[in-house]
């Protein structure tokens, strides 16, 4: 206060004011501070000071011919004085106004194209709806968010190459455009920007906005997709929020959302297959999201979500070093620990082997609806500070933290046996067993935890076992805070390894992620996800499995046909028939398979019985391990539409219907494609006789005895000749092949030879 009084005193003397306002600044240090370097030290002051001058702007000399010296009001628009240090003229801000009103108009066609991101934003805001303003305490936490709606996901280097190629195509310098997206964008932009008069530098800046994801670490309460972030200043203050629904959608948000859904579906499906890692990779490589290959998106998209990170790890990409437990992202902020196996007894006297972390550590926990700071020692929770949207969210965080602490009273709070299994029916590891148990019911856990008296600390309240707030008491070591805990800000990525059960570990062997951590939440993807892998056929239910299986056979019929006759076992083991098995009643799968395989063998052995439609119809049933039995079936049951439906062995049914005239196959009334039968099939007789394993030598030769029937042929030894009765009573001489390898050619040559032998 004294200083201020003294200064006021000084200022009241006129001499002081004169010295301060009139004296030149000639202290070297000050001059140096404000004149060294190109960087403006006080931009806003400079701007105000410049704009207070009469001619603060410099312009090219040509302006004097294009703009009059005075405007209609008689104000001077430019000065006859040249700018010191350049051959430009000094111009008044009024000249800009005159130019905007009366200057030449050029073509505006390129503006919406170059400034696309701005035009799009205006459209989104025009169609967005702003709701009421609510006044309430905002729990904001800093998260890394995308601040640039509507961008492609190119890396900075890829974008730089595209921009150089589009804006400065004649500049020297090697540019390699390799990725699909780079080539498409370059072609598109070159066409759009032909004869564009906007300054190349501006075009380059705007292209960068369109091509690269820009992220910032911002305090957010609520939506984090880029469409919400662009109106952050309108939707949340320190003590208020305004509801907002975006108008329209932007591709980058749609890609992020659809990628998460695809990754979750793929990880869930892979986890239950025989070789989860191989299956996961096969599915990632054969899936497209909005027409772009999923693996390309994974390489470029920085989204951090458990399933997405598992897919990235499988592809050998780096991921964040934080780990996931109970749906929360944990990041260790200090301390260290070593792992040791320990056997513990639950309240139900069940023995659990847990990996105990020995040592003092501090973590931040960040979830979708709650965040926390956790301090723990060996099997002891020291302190937990939680903040969340509501009681439910806070309870979820507390359960996860308590289980993670591995305290004895938590393990003793278990009632009943722990036998939770994952989707593949394997037992979960002990830590996830405990987590699932208490997520189902945490009453005993909270009651047994213990409570303590608390001191009054600003911004903190206690929480009782029934999750109500209190200022006097709280669960031991646990407090609820008004302030959120910021997400981990670093974008550092680490090298990880993944085992065949999809457990992701860092280089020190700590498990960062596992399929148990993948959310079960179902959503509807905003972009079309096309899973080409047969493993994903069942995602849309039994009907989709049925249709996809038959479509696959039809699409690959030429190779399937060859395998059917030459190497049936390999065909039956194809993974494309795996999903179909879930439609066949378990008890009878083996019998069906045995029956169909026998039927197929007869078809191979008996001339003229090859039947394309029947083979296609029954093939999926032959994939199950066969049981030998004498059972014959006239129809086979599949479980679709909530009940058993029949496929007739001979003839059409609602499930499988082949129209001979139109050559179309319909499955459950849905068109499944065109099915072309072999030319020989429709005209049975000599033409359809396919003597597999026999060479036709010519016409009947009496020296080899009476004509045998086709069934008697099987008794011949290799190289032995015989007459055989085929088709409509014609007889030809055949020899049983010495080698099996040429069997397939028989079906092609047999028809020709038979015709020659008979004619």
Curated annotation (Swiss-Prot):
Its main location: virion. Coiled coil: none annotated. GO terms for molecular function: RNA binding; RNA-directed RNA polymerase activity. The record marks 627 as: Mammalian adaptation. Keywords: Cap snatching, Eukaryotic host gene expression shutoff by virus, Eukaryotic host transcription shutoff by virus, Host gene expression shutoff by virus, Host mitochondrion, Host nucleus, Host-virus interaction, Inhibition of host innate immune response by virus, Inhibition of host MAVS by virus, Inhibition of host RLR pathway by virus, Inhibition of host RNA polymerase II by virus, mRNA capping, mRNA processing, Viral immunoevasion, Viral transcription, Virion. It is found in: Virion; Host nucleus; Host mitochondrion. The keyword Glycoprotein does not apply. InterPro entries: Flu_PB2_2nd, Flu_PB2_6th, Flu_PB2_C, Flu_PB2_CAP-bd, Flu_PB2_middle, Flu_PB2_N, INV_PB2, PB2_helical. GO terms for biological process: 7-methylguanosine mRNA capping; cap snatching; DNA-templated transcription; symbiont-mediated suppression of host cytoplasmic pattern recognition receptor signaling pathway via inhibition of MAVS activity; symbiont-mediated suppression of host gene expression; symbiont-mediated suppression of host mRNA transcription via inhibition of RNA polymerase II activity; viral RNA genome replication. Transmembrane segments: none annotated. GO terms for cellular component: host cell mitochondrion; host cell nucleus; virion component. Gene3D superfamilies: Polymerase Basic Protein 2, C-terminal domain. It comes from the Viruses. A motif (Nuclear localization signal) lies at residues 736-739. Plays an essential role in transcription initiation and cap-stealing mechanism, in which cellular capped pre-mRNAs are used to generate primers for viral transcription. Recognizes and binds the 7-methylguanosine-containing cap of the target pre-RNA which is subsequently cleaved after 10-13 nucleotides by the viral protein PA. Plays a role in the initiation of the viral genome replication and modulates the activity of the ribonucleoprotein (RNP) complex. Influenza RNA polymerase is composed of three subunits: PB1, PB2 and PA. Interacts (via N-terminus) with PB1 (via C-terminus). Interacts with nucleoprotein NP (via N-terminus). Interacts (via N-terminus) with host MAVS (via N-terminus); this interaction inhibits host innate immune response. Belongs to the influenza viruses PB2 family. This is Polymerase basic protein 2. It comes from Influenza A virus (strain A/Memphis/18/1978 H3N2). The lineage of its organism: Viruses, Riboviria, Orthornavirae, Negarnaviricota, Polyploviricotina.
């Amino acid at each position: 206060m004294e200083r201020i009084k003294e200064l006021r005193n000084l200022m009241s003397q006129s001499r002081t004011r004169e010295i301060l306002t009139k004296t030149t600044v000639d202290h070297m240090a000050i001059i140096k501070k404000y004149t060294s370097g190109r960087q403006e030290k006080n931009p806003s002051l400079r701007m105000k000071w410049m704009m207070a001058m009469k001619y603060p702007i410099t312009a090219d000399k040509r302006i004097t011919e294009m703009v009059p010296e005075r405007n209609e009001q008689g104000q001077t628009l430019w000065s006859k004085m040249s700018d010191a240090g350049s051959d430009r003229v000094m111009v008044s801000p009024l000249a800009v106004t005159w130019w905007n009103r009366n200057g030449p108009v050029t073509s505006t066609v390129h503006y919406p194209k170059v400034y696309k991101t701005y035009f799009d934003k205006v459209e989104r805001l025009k169609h967005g709806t702003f709701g009421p303003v609510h006044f309430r305490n905002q729990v904001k936490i800093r998260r890394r968010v995308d601040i640039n709606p509507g961008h492609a996901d190119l890396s900075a280097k890829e974008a730089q190459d595209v921009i150089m190629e589009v804006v400065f195509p004649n500049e020297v310098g090697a540019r390699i455009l390799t990725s699909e997206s780079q080539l498409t964008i370059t072609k598109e932009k070159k066409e759009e920007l032909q004869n564009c008069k906007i300054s190349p530098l501006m075009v380059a800046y705007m292209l960068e906005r369109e091509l690269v994801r820009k992220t910032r670490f911002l305090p957010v309460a609520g939506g984090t997709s880029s469409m919400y972030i662009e109106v952050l200043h309108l939707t949340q203050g320190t003590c208020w929020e305004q509801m907002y629904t975006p108008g329209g959608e932007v591709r980058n948000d749609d890609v992020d959302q659809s990628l998460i859904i695809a990754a979750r579906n793929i990880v869930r499906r892979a986890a239950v297959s025989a070789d989860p890692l191989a299956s996961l990779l096969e599915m990632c490589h054969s899936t497209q999201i909005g027409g772009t290959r999923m693996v390309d998106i994974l390489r470029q998209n920085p989204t951090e979500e458990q399933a997405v990170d598992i897919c990235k790890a499988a592809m050998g990409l780096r991921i964040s070093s934080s780990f996931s437990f109970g749906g929360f992202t944990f990041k260790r902020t200090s301390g260290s620990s070593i792992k040791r196996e320990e056997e513990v007894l639950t309240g139900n006297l069940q023995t659990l082997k847990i990996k105990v972390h020995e040592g003092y550590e501090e973590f931040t926990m960040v979830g979708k609806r709650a965040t926390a700071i956790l301090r723990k020692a060996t099997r002891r929770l020291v302190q937990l500070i939680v903040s969340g949207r509501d009681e439910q969210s806070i309870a979820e965080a507390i359960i996860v933290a308590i289980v993670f602490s591995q305290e004895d009273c938590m393990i003793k709070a278990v009632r009943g046996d722990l036998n939770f299994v994952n989707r593949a029916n394997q037992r979960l590891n002990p830590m996830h067993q405990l987590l699932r148990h208490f997520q189902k019911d945490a009453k005993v856990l909270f009651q047994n935890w213990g409570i303590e008296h608390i001191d009054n600390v600003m911004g903190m309240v206690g929480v009782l076992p029934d999750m109500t707030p209190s200022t006097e008491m709280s669960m031991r070591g646990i407090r609820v805070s008004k302030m959120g805990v910021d997400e981990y800000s670093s974008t550092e990525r680490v090298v990880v390894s993944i085992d065949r059960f999809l457990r992701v570990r860092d280089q020190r062997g700590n498990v960062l992620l596992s399929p148990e951590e993948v959310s079960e939440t179902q959503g509807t993807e905003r972009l079309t996800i096309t899973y080409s892998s047969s493993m994903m056929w069942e995602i849309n239910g039994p009907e989709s499995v049925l249709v996809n299986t038959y479509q696959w056979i039809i699409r690959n019929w030429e190779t399937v046909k060859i395998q059917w006759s030459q190497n049936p076992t390999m065909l039956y083991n194809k993974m494309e028939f795996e999903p179909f098995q879930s439609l066949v009643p378990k008890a009878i799968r083996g019998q069906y398979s045995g029956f169909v395989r026998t039927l197929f063998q007869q078809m191979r052995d008996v001339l003229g019985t090859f039947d394309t439609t029947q083979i296609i119809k029954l093939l999926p049933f032959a994939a199950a391990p066969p049981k030998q039995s004498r059972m014959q079936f006239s129809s086979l049951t599949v479980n679709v539409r909530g009940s058993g439906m029949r496929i007739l062995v001979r003839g059409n049914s609602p499930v499988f219907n082949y129209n001979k005239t139109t050559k179309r196959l319909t499955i459950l009334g849905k068109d499944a494609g065109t099915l072309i039968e072999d030319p020989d099939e429709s005209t049975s007789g000599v033409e359809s006789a396919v003597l597999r394993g026999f060479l036709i030598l010519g016409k009947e030769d009496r020296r080899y005895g009476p004509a045998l029937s086709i069934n008697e042929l099987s008794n011949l030894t290799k190289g032995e000749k015989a007459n055989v009765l085929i088709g409509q009573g014609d007889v030809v001489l055949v020899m049983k092949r010495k080698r099996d390898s040429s069997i397939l050619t028989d079906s092609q040559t047999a028809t020709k030879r038979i015709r020659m032998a008979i004619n």
